[in-house]
Amino acid sequence: MPVLRSTFIALSRNRPLRRFCEQSRLGSRLSSRFIAGTEIADAVRVAESVNRQGMAVTLDSLGESVTSDVEAHRSAEVYHQLLDIIESRKLNANISVKLTQMGLEQSQVLAESIALSLAQHAKATGNFVRIDMEDSKLTQVTLDIVRRLNARPETKGAIGVVIQAYLYRSQADVEQLLADGIRIRLCKGAYKEPAEVAFPRKSEVDENFVLLSKKLLDSNVFHGLATHDEAMVAAAKSYAKQHSIARSRFEFQMLYGVRRDLQRSLVKEGFGVRVYVPFGREWYPYFMRRLAERPANVIFLAKNFFRA
């Protein structure tokens, strides 16, 4: 793993730096490129703007592992509010949820019950819940919960999951999820993982991403290909064209503030694009992972630091 990426991932776990950044005006200003803001109203404002540009949205209330049932239910309430707002404002948006925010590390039963309530709410309002994938020690339990919820009549089709191409296990996971008809967001993976569970080289991750993309495109389920890598985008477009796969059968997904030029270009070409819009007060770990992923993001940060 490149030194720069390792450094920013390590900094994402630095609590004193996190407190300083999340509480300072400078930190909020620098993060605004990638974070919609701290409040629900900020997220709605950005979602409406993205929709006007012809793109869909997935909303993410930032925050990871909670330490109590009360915190888990408080996190869930934000998402219930979002589902109601999406319906009332007629936003082209869904929600992305981390199970650790729903208490997974305290109780699997708690996390699954909260995810069930969100999926029921989503289905009742014609919406959809994407369960985010976290580090590899949570992969199996996350997939188990998603599969159980999708098997329930009252939530079937209203819940999907994320698969990370850098994990060795992902091909088998994709095949099982496709057999169950579960919608997938395919990404490369943003967490630091050991070579025992993940491909260590970018070229291997890219190769697996392309392989898994083709499996998704060949299915009759609507999926999202989450990448800012133009080579990955080009490979998917080429495969879809060669196999007469309609553009309505998949979408590209990208992060708010990253590769806006590519987002606009894909929309002009007639491809579906969904923008991942995060918001909330606990934005620091997410922000640092974005810096770890792309050197261009670090350059952007440096320029704006000196302007600030």
Where are the model-predicted features located?
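Positively charged, amphipathic and often flexible ligand-engagement surfaces
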Residues: 1-308
